[in-house]
Amino acid sequence: MKQGLILLAVFMFALTGISMAAGINQINRDGHVLNYSDIALGGIMAGTTRAEVEEIYGAPTTRTEPEWSDARNDMIDTYTYGTSFHVKFIGDRAEFINTDAPNGIATPAGVTVGDPQSKILRIYGKPYRYSKAENGRETFVYRDQYHIGLAFTAQRGFITSIGIVGSE
């Protein structure tokens, strides 16, 4: 009897260790809230200045002309690098960042467009918000404590775009 209880205790302890280890690599374990540093694309975060973006990537391939936004009460323009990495500035700070092709631009956890959709849940855990459209497109949205959003779009089992929204 005593030996059976000891064996049961060892088994329970081992099972606890295995379940804890399974969650170690998962970023989003606490109420669907990421750390601010987890929300970046290619080293660019919401709030990164225009000068910092240019320091990392140089001059953009294309740039839209700044336009006034009544909703934001500031000027808005977009830098595009290549054809698939977009950084939208409100004033002098990056507010929306998006990549929509397999171009090597990654999150700090190494997730890129073209990766299997399963990588999203494996690394980030349960999303703050999830939706699936009739066409099969799935959207996984995560956020930090400041409501900065990190969104993944997937279709047919693969990530098709990754975006950051400065205020979700």
Please describe what each predicted stretch is:
Residues 8-16:
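Bacterial N-terminal signal peptides
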Residues 141-157:
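Short, exposed beta-strand-loop hairpins at the edges of beta-sheets
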Residues 1-4:
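Positively charged n-region of N-terminal signal peptides that target proteins for export
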Residues 6, 103-105, 147:
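Short Gly/Pro-enriched loop/turn and capping motifs at secondary-structure junctions
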